[in-house]
């Protein structure tokens, strides 16, 4: 359905859901990225569509709501876009048929995979193209769609907002986490660290509990860079993708999915995982491999950070990143790097340089245009600012088994837990931070 656009800027319609919690950085990034590569961009807030109930016959449900979805589609189509881009995708399905009937491709970005795959696998087939932040979900989505227009695409950064040197460094807490610290396994890591500091270091955990944008202590996107830059060490622990107890009992074991036909080789979760996680709609208990936005944003600011070792993509794309496989190791590395500022800054600069050269939303949006066929190649005017295309486009070839569950972490490779470091020669009694001499391609 996509047509190559040449001789004029591509027109990208952003159908955004402004009410999403923790997606402001994404929404800001897509607009910035498309504009920076020369696209004409216009936004539509489709949040009112969330009132339309979702059902298996979504188009029927939408039509029962009269002109609301049709009106949004008409407004968008009057602008004559080359692509409609829907972040998250859950409510964009109400306009997807109208958009495609007019001959315009519509793509969604699945930003909460694999935690929501029990739902996304049902509505993603209604889009022309699907982009997922986690390659572990690609086989499922391809199987549900019956075609290959499914692509792996990580989050990125808006470097007008997240870049080094713009904010005062290191004046705040020694360690800072920005996000929902109540999600497993973060409490184990951060409570252990909090106990170990015991006055020896200061921590800023924002937030210990689930909050929304109406919360009086809500920290808006404009404040992210200054807050993260204030720390000596950024704290980053990825959520566990394992199915939640509520999802297992209310969605899977209740027979709710009895009418859903899965692709060959896939099956719904049939036994309790070793530990309940945060996959509130992860009905198949799929594993996770992706790197979260927090890593890219903290790194782009030039702030050193410590992450958990449960994500294979972190080990593959950032082999010199410092990771910990358990709370005890997390604490050990926190104090080691707190006491070694020069080594900390050298690691931070390496990570920052790599993010700024390969992982901005300019790179992500350029890749989108290539994948959907609006560009045949990168315009010559952008080649110098984006760098070599092979360095920043995502590989789409991964060996993954549909039998794999979240109880089999994708991140515990040797490179993630036992690499050698070219940067540090720890003295007796210190932990040797992980790293390697390789810079891997996307």
Model-derived regions: residue spans:
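Nucleotide-sugar donor-binding catalytic core of glycosyltransferases
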Residues: 2-67, 71, 79, 87-94, ...
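Short amphipathic alpha-helix with an adjacent loop that forms part of the alpha/beta core around
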Residues: 73-77, 337
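Catalytic alpha-helical scaffold of carbohydrate-active enzymes acting on polysaccharides/glycoconjugates
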Residues: 77, 97-98, 116
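Active-site proximal beta-strand in glycosyltransferases
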Residues: 99-113
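Ser/Thr/Gly-rich flexible loops in soluble cytosolic domains mediating phosphotransfer, phosphorylation
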Residues: 111-121
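Residue-level signal for the nucleotide or nucleotide-sugar donor/cofactor binding architecture
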Residues: 293, 325, 359
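Conserved acidic donor-binding segment of nucleotide-sugar-dependent glycosyltransferases
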Residues: 321-328, 337-341
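C-terminal amphipathic helix plus adjacent low-complexity
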Residues: 332-442
């Amino acid at each position: 359905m996509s047509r190559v656009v040449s001789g004029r800027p591509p027109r990208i319609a952003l159908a955004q859901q402004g009410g999403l919690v923790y997606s402001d950085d994404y929404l800001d990034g897509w607009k910035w990225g498309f504009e920076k590569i020369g696209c004409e961009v216009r936004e539509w807030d489709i949040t009112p569509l969330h009132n339309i109930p979702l059902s298996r016959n979504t188009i029927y449900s939408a039509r029962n709501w009269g002109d609301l979805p049709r009106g949004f589609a008409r407004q968008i189509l009057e602008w004559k876009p080359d692509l409609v881009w829907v972040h998250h995708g859950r409510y964009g399905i109400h306009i997807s048929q109208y958009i495609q009937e007019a001959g315009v491709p519509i793509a969604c970005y699945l930003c909460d995979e694999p935690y929501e795959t029990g739902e996304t696998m049902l509505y993603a087939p209604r889009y022309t193209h699907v982009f997922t932040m986690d390659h572990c979900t690609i086989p499922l989505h391809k199987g549900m769609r019956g075609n290959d227009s499914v692509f792996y695409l990580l989050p990125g950064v808006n470097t007008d907002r997240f870049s080094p040197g713009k904010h005062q460094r290191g004046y705040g807490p020694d360690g800072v986490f920005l996000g929902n610290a109540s999600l497993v396994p973060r409490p184990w890591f951060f409570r252990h660290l909090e106990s170990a500091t015991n006055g020896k270091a200061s921590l800023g955990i924002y937030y210990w509990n689930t909050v929304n944008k109406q919360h009086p202590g809500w920290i808006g996107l404009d404040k992210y860079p200054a807050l993260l830059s204030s720390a000596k060490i950024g704290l980053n622990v990825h959520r566990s993708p394992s199915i939640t107890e509520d999802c297992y009992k209310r969605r899977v074991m209740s027979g709710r999915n009895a009418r859903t036909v899965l692709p060959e080789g896939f099956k719904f979760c049939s036994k309790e995982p070793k530990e309940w996680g945060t996959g509130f709609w992860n009905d198949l208990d799929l594993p996770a491999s992706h790197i979260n936005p927090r890593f890219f944003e903290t790194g782009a600011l030039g702030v050193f950070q410590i992450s958990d070792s449960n994500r294979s993509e972190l080990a593959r794309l950032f082999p010199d990143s410092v990771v910990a496989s358990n709370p005890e190791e997390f604490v050990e590395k926190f104090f080691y790097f707190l006491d070694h500022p020069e080594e900390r800054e050298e690691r931070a600069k390496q990570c920052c340089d790599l993010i700024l050269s390969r992982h901005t939303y300019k790179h992500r949006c350029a890749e989108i245009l290539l994948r959907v066929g609006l560009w045949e190649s990168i315009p010559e005017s952008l080649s110098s600012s984006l760098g070599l295309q092979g360095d920043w486009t995502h590989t789409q070839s991964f060996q993954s088994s549909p039998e794999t569950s979240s109880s089999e972490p994708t991140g515990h490779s040797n490179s993630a837990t036992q690499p050698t470091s070219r940067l540090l020669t720890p003295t007796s009694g210190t932990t040797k931070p992980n790293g390697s001499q390789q810079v891997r391609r996307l």
